[in-house]
Structures are given as structure tokens and as C-alpha cells.
A protein has these predicted regions:
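Hydrophobic alpha-helical transmembrane segments of polytopic
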Residues: 14-22, 45-52, 80-90, 127
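Long, contiguous internal "core" modules enriched in hydrophobic/ aromatic residues
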Residues: 6-9, 13-28, 119-162
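Hydrophobic alpha-helical transmembrane segments of multi-pass membrane proteins
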Residues: 44-48, 60, 129-133
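Membrane-interface interhelical loops and short amphipathic "cap" helices
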Residues: 1-5, 28-46, 68-71, 75, ...
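Alpha-helical transmembrane segments of multi-pass membrane proteins
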Residues: 16-35, 54-56, 94-100, 143-144
Length: 162
């Protein structure tokens, strides 16, 4: 069975055309409705991040339980986990749109709302940024470590890691 993937020029062309259409759509969204575009970007990022984190959970569960049955399709969760660094970059870009997304990021609104003022130690921009950076750093380190273990298992053969 041949497992080599051959990427043709036509495939590359179609891929770049679709990426260009996506970029044009993103620019159009920012030009027409900034608030909706930031919200959609956040929602899409959370959706694909949840798939990647679910794959990381499944993958780590396989190592914790020393499961051998999943070895034949472990590349699928590895591929999904590869999205996490891209999600981190998108979240860093999202910092520019915090005021369009989160009500609590406006200090004048927090001062006038008793409930938001009570939650201010947790819901504030600096602490939010710190949390996001720390979460993504932990997730990226975890997934890189899991990937390293997977590659070591490939090079050693069998289940020598356990």
C-alpha cells in the first residue's frame, strides 16, 4: 500500500484560490460589519480549537491508559492538535477586537454595572490576556510533548515507551 501523498499543481492552485477567497471575505467582513466579524472569528476559532483540544485529550488518554489499539489512526488526532499554535495566533489577533466582543472590556460600562464591577478582578483585559497566553502555552507544550512521544515510539518500534 502506497502511503505517499502526491500534491499536484492543480491541488495547490485550488488551495491558494480558496485561501485568497477566505482572506477577501475576511477583509469584506471587517469593512462592512466589524463587530460581527470579530464575533465570527472568535466563534470559529473556539470551534476548531475545541476539536484540537478534544483530539489532544483523546491522544493523551491513549498514552495514560497505554492503549495499543489506537496506534493505527493516531495521526488523525496529531493532525488536529497541530491547529493549536494557529489558534494561539488568531487569539493574539483577537486582542485587537476585545472591545467589539466583550462587554466587560469597557471600563466605563464596568463602573456603571454592579455585577460587572463585582466580577472585575476576573473579567479585566490584562488578566484575560495573561490567562489566554498561559493556557495556550500549556496546550502547545503538551501537544508538542505528545507528538515527541509519538515520534519516539515510531523510531523505537512497538510499545517500548510503556
Amino acid at each position: 500500500m502506497d502511503t505517499n501523498v502526491i500534491v499536484t499543481k492543480k491541488f495547490n492552485y485550488i488551495t491558494f484560490v480558496l485561501m485568497a477567497l477566505g482572506a477577501i471575505g475576511l477583509v469584506y467582513g471587517f469593512l462592512t460589519d466589524t463587530h460581527r466579524t470579530w464575533a465570527n472569528l472568535l466563534l470559529n476559532n473556539y470551534y476548531f480549537l475545541s476539536l484540537a483540544l478534544g483530539a489532544a485529550f483523546f491522544f493523551s488518554l491513549q498514552y495514560i491508559t497505554q492503549s495499543g489499539w489506537s496506534a493505527m489512526f493516531r495521526r488523525i488526532p496529531e493532525a488536529l492538535m497541530a491547529y493549536i499554535p494557529y489558534a494561539a495566533v488568531i487569539m493574539l489577533v483577537m486582542f485587537f477586537g476585545l472591545h467589539d466582543i466583550y462587554h466587560w472590556s469597557h471600563p466605563d460600562l464596568v463602573a456603571g454595572d454592579e455585577l460587572l464591577a463585582h466580577k472585575a478582578p476576573y473579567l479585566n483585559v490584562p488578566f484575560f490576556m495573561i490567562r489566554i497566553v498561559l493556557f495556550f502555552a500549556a496546550w502547545i507544550l503538551l501537544t508538542r510533548y505528545l507528538r515527541k512521544l509519538s515520534l519516539q515510539e515510531d523510531s523505537l518500534g512497538g510499545i517500548e515507551m510503556f
